[in-house]
């Protein structure tokens, strides 16, 4: 996506351009082979899209270049636009020396194309190719990214540049906007430190569970009393939107009276991001690509890792503005983009917004109007400080996930509705993701809500969050914190269908 603005006309031109690629049969597990064979297309069929995974330079500012593994030599990867319910073919070439996974985040796809080794998805072999055939759904803003482990290698996994947006066109478009702008937020040049996490208090409700807090703080105090330092955390040197630092990319040019639909993706490996546009508000119409029951105007957007927000901004305050992160240091190091009204001269202006707390429930139905679950599953998150060679180890119900023994922890039956009661005994905010399904938000730190469908939810420090999902997509299903540093060190679990 070289241009932030994607018009419908540009989409039609893009959709008409396809690249032929030779079909290469990958190595499969037996189950994945059967699933893929059912969707196989003739060798001569041209793909709808072709993606190439390879190292490439990214010019984040004039004469300032970083190197990263990317899709098609660019960051972010190309915008892929699909039609809901219409089968697509994507050829993925891996030009690196490392087997790769490409995860279709937020889509209801089968295991063999989901892109997670933990579920058994075949790897895209080094210097090889896989042809992926699937039916895109549900409609809305999704994305694709690597699902490889990073660990201590801060050039691998989601620390790399392997992130790209997906927009699945609904069968019916409600309209209400003049054009779309896609923004991908991403940091580069990560490094390790032992400073500990910086407290963030933007989530509402702010209610903490005393039992969870006592357990988490007690464990941390005990660890520090033994002389153990804080576990490693990741920080970054450069911050970008669409691969360019603030002031060094093309501005988003607008006209007075335009209604611009911004599709915002937090493509970070580890960071929670905020976004504000002075003198304007965002009318949030979708979270993680799913329409919200109650669209609401807000002054600030908050996005956990891998979250997406679609919001309409009415351009009615002419000027040249900075749309940027609330954190002054992050914004000064690049996390922003210029919004420029036609005919308006001058330097971009930033005005810090008033304090604002992010509450998912403001976009939902009031009260608990959702169906009762068939079963409730209790899930406890816990941190073992610096337990793995200086890195924090994370557990779900006292078990740290292991790829050597990836046994399913939870068992579900098709067609049943399950409530996940997630309890966070750490002070970290965890963006929790469930593969191949969406879930409904039910309760947020004691506050009931309904109707909000997501595939990532931020679970606040020492808080409890409840979500419901329907087991309607058989196969192994990965559940994890989307912070690379957490999922690499135990914060994952598998569901299976029985």
Model regions: which residues?
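Histidine-centered copper-binding motifs that mark active-site loops
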Residues: 2-5, 15-18, 22-305, 311, ...
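TerminUS-proximal long segments
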Residues: 460-498
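Active/binding-pocket-proximal capping segment
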Residues: 278-291, 397-399, 425-452, 484-488, ...
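Short, conserved beta-strand segments of beta-strand-rich sandwich/propeller modules, principally
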Residues: 141-143, 261, 320-322, 419, ...
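Terminal connector regions
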Residues: 152-153, 319-340, 482, 487-490
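C-terminal soluble interaction/assembly domains
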Residues: 441-472
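C-terminal structural cap/anchor segments
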Residues: 377, 383-389, 396-397, 401-427
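A structural feature that tracks compact, well-ordered secondary-structure segments
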Residues: 263-267, 273-278, 311-314, 322-328, ...
């Amino acid at each position: 996506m070289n241009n932030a603005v994607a018009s419908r006309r540009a989409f039609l031109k893009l959709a008409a351009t396809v690249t032929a690629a030779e079909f290469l049969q990958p190595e499969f597990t037996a189950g994945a082979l059967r699933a893929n064979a059912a969707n196989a297309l003739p060798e001569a069929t041209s793909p709808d899209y072709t993606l190439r995974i390879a190292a490439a330079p990214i010019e984040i500012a004039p004469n300032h270049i970083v190197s990263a593994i990317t899709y098609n030599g660019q960051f972010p990867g190309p915008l892929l636009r699909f039609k809901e319910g219409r089968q697509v073919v994507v050829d993925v070439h891996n030009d690196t020396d490392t087997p790769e996974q490409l995860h279709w985040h937020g889509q209801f796809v089968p295991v063999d194309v989901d892109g997670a080794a933990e579920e058994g998805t075949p790897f895209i072999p080094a210097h090889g190719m896989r042809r992926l055939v699937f039916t895109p759904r549900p409609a809305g803003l999704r994305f694709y990214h690597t699902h490889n482990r990073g660990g201590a290698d801060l050039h691998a996994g989601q620390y790399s540049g392997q992130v790209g947006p997906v927009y699945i066109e609904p069968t019916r478009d409600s309209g209400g906007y003049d054009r779309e702008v896609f923004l991908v937020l991403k940091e580069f040049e990560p490094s390790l430190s032992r400073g500990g996490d910086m407290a963030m208090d933007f989530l509402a409700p702010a209610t903490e569970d005393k039992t969870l807090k006592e357990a988490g703080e007690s464990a941390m105090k005990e660890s520090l009393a033994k002389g153990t330092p804080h576990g490693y955390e990741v920080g970054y040197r450069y911050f970008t939107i669409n691969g360019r630092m603030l002031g060094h990319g093309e501005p988003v040019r607008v006209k007075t009276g335009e209604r611009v639909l911004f599709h915002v993706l937090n493509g970070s490996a580890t960071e929670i991001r905020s976004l504000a546009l002075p003198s304007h508000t965002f009318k949030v119409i979708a979270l993680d690509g799913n329409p919200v029951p109650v669209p609401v105007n807000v002054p600030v957007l908050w996005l956990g890792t891998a979250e997406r927000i679609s919001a309409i901004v009415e351009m009615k305050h002419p000027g040249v503005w900075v749309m940027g992160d609330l954190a002054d240091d992050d914004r000064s190091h690049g996390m922003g983009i210029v919004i420029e009204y036609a005919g308006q001269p001058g330097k971009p202006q930033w005005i810090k917004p008033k304090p604002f707390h992010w509450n998912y429930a403001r976009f939902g139905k009031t009260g608990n109007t959702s169906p009762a679950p068939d079963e409730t599953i209790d899930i406890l998150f816990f941190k073992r400080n610096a337990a793995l060679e200086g890195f924090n180890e994370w557990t779900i119900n006292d078990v740290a996930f292991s790829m050597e023994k990836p046994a399913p922890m939870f068992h579900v039956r098709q067609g049943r509705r399950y409530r996940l009661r997630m309890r966070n005994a750490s002070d970290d905010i965890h963006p929790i993701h469930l593969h191949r399904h969406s879930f409904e938000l039910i309760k947020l730190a004691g506050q009931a809500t309904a109707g909000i469908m997501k595939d990532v939810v931020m679970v606040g420090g020492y808080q409890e969050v409840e979500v419901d999902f329907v087991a309607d997509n058989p196969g192994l299903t990965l559940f994890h914190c989307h912070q690379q540093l957490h999922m690499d060190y135990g914060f994952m679990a598998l569901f299976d269908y029985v």
